[in-house]
Amino acid sequence: MKLSNLSEDYKNKTLNLFVVNILIVGILPIIFYFVLGYFSGFGFYIINSQLILNFQNISLYILALGVLIPISILFATLFTGLDRNKISNIFPLLTNFVIYGLLFYLAAVIIIFIFCFFLFLNELLGLKVIFIAIGAALSLAFFYIFPPLVKGVFNFTKINYVPIVGVSLNKKDHSKIFSVVSDLSKKINAKMPKNIVLGLSTDFFAISKDLKVFNGINQTTLKNETLYISIPYLRILTIKELEGIIGHELGHFEGKDTIYAMKFAPIFRRLNEHFLALDEEFEDKKKEFKSDPMLIKLAVYPFIFLFNEFSRKEERISKEQELKADKFGADASESSDVFITALSKLYIYDLVWEDTKNKFKEIVREKIKNKIKNLSLEFVRTARLLLEKDKLKVYLKNLQFYEQLHPSDTHPPLEDRMKNLGVKMEKISNKSLVNFLPSSASLIPNIDLIEENLTIVLNEIEKFQNES
């Protein structure tokens, strides 16, 4: 999973982030507390001194709330350690506390400021028209500052459901693939996914939450467990190799992984998606105003602290999960060598997919007449053109330290995965890396039609993005 620049800039800086957060949330309530102490309540209007004392107390409560946010993050990260059950139960609650705690904090600070400013006009300036105008101008300036702060926090309350482009299969028409998945589920004692989705990407993943799928005509929401399968990789994987990859993904439906995937992973990914969106917004603001949007950055510091503290845990847990799931994959394919060959293909041919995808985007963007009708078959043709059959082992040796990006995590380097299963590089041959038979594509009836329809959908999406 690609992390945002905001997160990367403060990686492994727990103490710095903690101190910065304490200062950010503490400074305004402290200022308000002491400023309120200077007002007597006598002026154009008589203000009850008890009301002023009440606002002083509120500023202390807001100070306590603000400081509690970074402290709770720090204590939560110490308490949960690497315990997946604790993380799964505490992280969602902590995230909501940070989001709504900050919104309440900002709302209270705005109210206290308005009250302080009213007292200032009332006591010192007697509510004369000229001073009211000055006060209004200053208030407008203050409200110019706060919307970006509120926006920075409010961004994290949104839930953006981006649908997956793909086709949801049914058991009646696609009994072969359902039968394979069912047999593998029983073999490794994992939960059988209710849904199987095919998509034109190089992703394989298993997910235990609702998933929106768009097939070009309708958008449907799939409930319960879903297995997503890459159509392009069906073209290059043998049936046994595909069984290994599916076995790996089904391994994530086993035991604690399911609870962790349902409660922690979606919220963690959502936070990261918001950070990535903020990265783009900050870049746009820099180009437009020639400066950093510091006010929004100040508002999201608590989220950076929250995200970074748990991202370190996620990295370690994710690696442990992947290596554990690899053993399920090896069992499913009946051989560690076969499973590692399948993984090796994913690492190597992913490079070809990037080239194919870029070519496809360029054709759409430049409105070239020779359109790609089947992106999956174009991927296979490109692979045969670009990859020299007798040099695939060389590519593989160069890729063995590469961490493969995945929609929900980062897979460990291939070298670690080979060591985990006791497979040496010598076991992988050039011949096995270019062998696509018996093809796993044979498990899907009318696969060409599915590929062509999804290629049309991706073509239209790309055209829309270029025009907008």
Residue ranges and their predicted role:
Residues 209-222, 267-308, 366-370:
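Short, flexible helix-coil linker/hinge segments at the edges of structured domains or between repeats
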Residues 255-289, 339-347, 428:
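Post-HEXXH active-site segment of zinc metalloproteases
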Residues 2-19, 80-99, 232-264, 322, ...:
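Membrane-interface, cytosolic juxtamembrane amphipathic helix immediately N-terminal to a transmembrane helix
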Residues 76-92, 269-272, 276-283, 307-324, ...:
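Hydrophobic topogenic segments
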Residues 1-206, 350, 427-435, 444-468:
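Hydrophobic or amphipathic, alpha-helical segments that drive membrane association/targeting
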Residues 1-67, 287-318, 323, 327, ...:
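Cytosolic-facing loops and C-terminal tails of multi-pass membrane proteins
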Residues 152-262, 266:
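Peri-catalytic and regulatory segments of divalent metal-dependent proteins
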